[in-house]
Swiss-Prot record:
Inhibitory receptor on lymphocytes that negatively regulates antigen receptor signaling via PTPN6/SHP-1 and PTPN11/SHP-2. May interact in cis (on the same cell) or in trans (on other cells) with TNFRSF14. In cis interactions, appears to play an immune regulatory role inhibiting in trans interactions in naive T cells to maintain a resting state. In trans interactions, can predominate during adaptive immune response to provide survival signals to effector T cells. The lineage of its organism: Eukaryota, Metazoa, Chordata, Craniata, Vertebrata. The chain crosses the membrane at residues 184-204. Residues 32-134 form the Ig-like V-type domain. GO terms for cellular component: external side of plasma membrane; plasma membrane. Disulfide bonds join 40-69, 64-124, 78-85. It comes from Rattus norvegicus. This is B- and T-lymphocyte attenuator.
Amino acid sequence: MKTVPAMLVTPRSFREFFILLLGLWSILCKEPTKRIGEECRVQLKIKRNSSRSAWTGELFKIECPVTYCVHRPNVTWCKHNGTRCVPLEVGPQLHTSWVENDQASAFVLYFEPIHLSDDGVYTCSANLNSEVINSHSVVIHVTERTQNCSEHPLITASDIPDATNASRPSTMEERPGRTWLLYALLPLGTSLLLLACVCLLCFLRRIQGKEKKPSDLAGRERETNLVDIPVSSRTNSQILTSETGIYDNDPWSSRLGESESTISSQLEGNKQGIVYASLNHCVIGRTPRQASKIQEAPTEYASICVRS
């Protein structure tokens, strides 16, 4: 009797196959750092002959870049005192923290604030599996602050992620606000200047208009007087023409006698005066409308007699 191939797969063989599969999976998923130990050494990447400067009263910090594999090492800071490196005591003025990102990790030492006694040489050391690794030294030069040293910027709490008790504002953050305020005030100042110029021009024009009004009124009064004078003369000339029309029928001798008698009577009243006689002729007005209505009349001339 022949056996079926499906009957060869027994529970025992299936269990052995599953164990073999798990072993292969664990080998393939093992960390590459576990297989290659040389590429996974702890490194402290502080540059040789590093030096930093600070002023007393500043919030200061120094960093120790650390490269490690899986387990993070125990990192500490120490300060050199002669031939020894004394570990630093963490307190309110000195504290440490880890700063990690995608590219690298760093163990940071914070001075809040830094004092003149903090001047010296500092070293970062890492301890992993009883193996101690020391970094290069960092020299910190602390200078006492005076009134002339206020131009140096301060490291504030905005630069330190773990500082929570910092109360001083950042001077670098205030400068952009002042520049934007200056840019906003410039258009306002120019608009106020233009408004002042427009108001000044309107005021000058109003003064000139007030000065011109009296001169215009005087000129108009003179024109009206000049226009009114010919009208009165025309009315007198019309009256005279109507009166002189009576003497047209008289003979020349009677008119001479009457003129002599009138002249003699006037001279007796005023012996030292001068008698003027007006010419009786029509005066043509300035306006063409009034001149068209006046009828021309004959002109009479009178003699003037002067006696001393």
